[in-house]
């Protein structure tokens, strides 16, 4: 009987440890679904986890401001919590292509991209083939001014130069056009990239793959 009681206690202890381990994740998901104090949850579209290997690193509190909403840009809302990421999903080996979400961005002076691209410190007109990558894929500027190949689901492809980081850790300020932090799986392409792929810019988002050129 004593042995059975000991085994039962061990099983109960293990069960309690398991519950304690998963509670923080459950709480985070609850907040992402729209919970949290003040009625403001995580921005739903940005709260979806793109990869189980890349979890949120934190959150920032939204502040609204002078946000250029061109190209379907999402503008920060006061008091809303936005998740941040220090990583991106793993890059596929062998140049097979890494799944990503293509978004639309103007890198021109006065466009919705905010300040000048960080790789070169200069702006690019909408006819140039340039992109920004989520923080993890930007990889500490290692892809600055390097080419990537972007492929649409329909088979079209284009080569574009990386000129900026789509910042997954900061946002909701003037440097980021008062937009939320970038999701962890974004290739932010100029209008020229969308045109070269034959995509409808009004859609604002498209499933693509990308690889280093």
Swiss-Prot record:
User: By its UniProt entry, which CDD domains does this protein fall under?
Assistant: DPBB_kiwellin-like
Question: So what family is this one in?
Answer: Belongs to the kiwellin family.
Q: Where in the cell is it found?
A: Secreted
| Signal peptide boundaries | 1-32
> Its GO CC terms?
extracellular region
Q: What is its main location?
A: secreted
Which portions of this protein are annotated as coiled-coil regions?
none
Which keywords belong to this entry? Secreted, Signal
| Top-rank lineage group of the source organism | Eukaryota
Q: What is this protein called?
A: Ripening-related protein 3
